[in-house]
């Protein structure tokens, strides 16, 4: 046998041995089985496809609601937070908004009706999120009889953006202020993403699983947003220079895609941890499930 062929054969044998060893660890040890469940869960939920679908719904449902609400309320803090994240210059938007008087009766009546329609159409985001949770946790999807849950979750997610804007404004620019802002943001996300799966699964999950999902989601979102504040403004400026407004759209959707991957991935990982054979899994399942 030639040396080249011998090297290839030895390489294949080594790869097969490593693969067999990895499979043995994944199937033969509790941590390995948990990792295997995480991988299988992410594949089964189709992480990339679900995240892109959720990101598109956020872009077309949640952001319009925040922008529309900012015209009639103090939710401009939410839009400023988004602008700061992406590095968008809001001068043109502010000039456009200043041309309209929200106190005018005709404009106010049309605006309230439009805001209501935006909120109703915005439930497409929460319907998509509900289907994702239903598939992950194997629970029945929400029917039209529980449609109020869709609207409550939508308003909760939108309001959290405004609340985070308030926290960032109050905290100030100093190091201590930034630390408080991060902790406040983490707390807001933890509450929001504990309540959201509770509502969208109709209370089918235990409190421990809900809090674990909320904390894991909040941690991921906080890290992504912190990193985004560093890299996104430059990326947005570059994309806008090269592609114009479409560049801002592409960058925004990419950012929302990363956030959506955290939302979907955190729920999937929490389920895998809840099925773990260790103390953590037994704790998340609770006394009744472990009996």
Give names to the regions the model predicted.
Residues 1-291:
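Membrane-embedded alpha-helices and immediately adjacent juxtamembrane helical segments
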């Amino acid at each position: 046998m030639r040396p080249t062929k011998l090297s290839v054969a030895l390489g294949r044998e080594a790869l097969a041995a490593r693969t067999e060893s990895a499979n043995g660890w994944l199937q033969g040890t509790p941590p390995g089985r948990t990792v295997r469940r995480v991988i299988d869960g992410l594949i089964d939920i189709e992480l990339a496809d679900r995240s892109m679908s959720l990101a598109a719904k956020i872009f077309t449902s949640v952001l319009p609601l925040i922008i529309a609400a900012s015209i009639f309320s103090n939710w401009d803090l939410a839009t400023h937070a988004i602008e700061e994240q992406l590095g968008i210059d809001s001068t043109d938007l502010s000039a456009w908004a200043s041309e309209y008087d929200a106190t005018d009766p005709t404009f106010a009546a049309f605006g309230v009706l439009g805001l209501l329609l935006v909120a109703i159409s915005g439930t497409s985001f929460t319907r998509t999120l509900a289907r994702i949770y239903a598939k992950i946790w194997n629970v029945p999807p929400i029917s039209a009889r529980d449609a109020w849950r869709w609207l409550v979750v939508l308003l909760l997610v939108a309001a959290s953006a405004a609340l985070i804007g308030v926290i960032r404004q109050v905290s100030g620019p100093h190091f201590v202020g930034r630390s408080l802002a991060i902790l406040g943001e983490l707390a807001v996300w933890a509450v929001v993403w504990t309540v959201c799966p509770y509502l969208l699964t109709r209370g089918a999950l235990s409190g421990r699983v809900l809090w674990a999902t909320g904390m894991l989601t909040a941690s991921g979102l906080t890290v992504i947003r912190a990193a985004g504040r560093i890299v996104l403004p430059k990326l947005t400026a570059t994309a806008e220079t090269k592609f114009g407004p479409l560049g801002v759209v592409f960058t925004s959707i990419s950012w929302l895609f990363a956030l959506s991957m955290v939302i979907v991935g955190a729920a999937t990982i929490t389920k895998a941890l809840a099925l773990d054979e260790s103390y953590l899994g037994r704790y998340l399942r609770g006394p009744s499930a472990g009996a």
